[in-house]
């Protein structure tokens, strides 16, 4: 079993000075915490794995292919592999749990 406390992950993320903190990686799934500052730029590229975002805190917009929508606390967004996507118009620091299936970079 793997178990995590969100408050501890947020603290670890702050200490890491990185935008993305991967905290679980098994063959069929990986998980991480992604934090973007208010007004920040999300420079990610499409991934070779399916992805789910769960917004823990903050407010922004996300563009997935040609669709655009607001996200806020509690929003859940599924992005299929190889689809262009990014957060933008980040109004409040955005903290997002990220789930990749299979594990990130396992389809390269």
Predicted segments — roles?
Residues 41-42, 61, 77, 81-86:
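Histidine-centered metal-chelating micro-motifs
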Residues 27-29, 37-41, 59, 102-105:
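Short, charged/polar surface micro-motifs in flexible loops or helix N-caps
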Residues 17, 32-47:
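Conserved short histidine dyad/triad with adjacent acidic residue
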Residues 81-106:
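Ligand-binding loop in jelly-roll beta-barrel domains
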Residues 27, 63-67, 90:
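Short strand-coil-strand connectors
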Residues 35-36, 47-62:
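Short, conserved beta-strand element in jelly-roll/cupin
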Residues 1-33, 108:
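A short, N-terminal "cap"/entry segment at the start of jelly-roll beta-barrel domains
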Residues 67-81:
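Short acidic-glycine-tyrosine-enriched beta hairpin
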